[in-house]
UniProtKB/Swiss-Prot annotation:
It is an enzyme of class 3 (hydrolase). Belongs to the thermonuclease family. The gene is nuc. Residues 1-23 form the signal peptide. Its EC number is 3.1.31.1. It catalyses: Endonucleolytic cleavage to nucleoside 3'-phosphates and 3'-phosphooligonucleotide end-products. This is Micrococcal nuclease. InterPro entries: SNase_OB-fold_sf (IPR035437), Staphylococal_nuclease_OB-fold (IPR016071), Thermonucl_AS (IPR002071). It comes from Shigella flexneri. The keyword Magnesium does not apply. Keywords: Endonuclease, Hydrolase, Nuclease, Plasmid, Signal. The active site is at residues 52, 60, 94. One of its GO terms (molecular function) is nucleic acid binding.
Length: 174
């Protein structure tokens, strides 16, 4: 009887733990780490959730503008409480989501702002493409405007897409 009760408690504890992990729903938490220009760690109920900003692709760390993109994401989110709207979980277990952080606007007004969009609008990231097509039409419009204005990475006439850079780097090591 005691072992059955212990097993039942263990199952109940596991269910509570699984249900309390916000990996399958929208959540709020504090950004505790910036991995690169499109990936952050968010602390939620003493658990760290890795979040990949959906629909954008920032330069890699070893790539031109990689450090600047990472720094800009840090400026916008580090130690801030953010809201994440989850789109899906990728094959690496990362939450793909839209990140909203409080930004202060002229006149002192603060409002939650789409950080994914800011990164693309400021030329710190590309609109993400899947088989050559943007996954979000609005992000692609932001990218075209940033490119037109030569903002951020678009100031470099030789800016290389992260997916091409990753492929070239992988081929160089093989």
């Amino acid at each position: 009887m005691k072992s059955a009760l212990a097993a039942l408690r263990a199952v109940a504890a596991a269910v509570v733990l699984i249900v309390s992990v916000p990996a399958w729903a929208d959540f709020r938490g504090e950004v505790v780490r910036i991995l690169d220009g499109d990936t952050i760690d968010v602390l939620v109920n003493r658990q760290t959730i890795r979040v990949r900003l959906a629909d954008i692709d920032a330069p890699e760390s070893g790539q031109a503008f990689g450090s600047r993109a990472r720094q800009r994401l840090a400026d916008l989110t580090f130690r801030q409480e953010v809201q994440v709207t989850e789109k899906e979980v990728d094959r690496y277990g990362r939450t793909l989501g839209v990140v909203y952080a409080p930004l202060q606007y002229p006149g002192g007004q603060t409002q939650l702002t789409n950080i994914n969009a800011i990164m693309v609008q400021e030329g710190m990231a590309w609109a993400y493409r899947y088989y050559g097509k943007p996954t979000d039409a609005q992000m692609y419009e932001y990218e075209k405007e940033a490119r037109r204005q030569r903002l951020g990475l678009w100031s470099d006439p030789n800016a290389q897409e992260p997916w091409k850079w990753r492929r070239a780097s992988k081929n160089a090591t093989n």
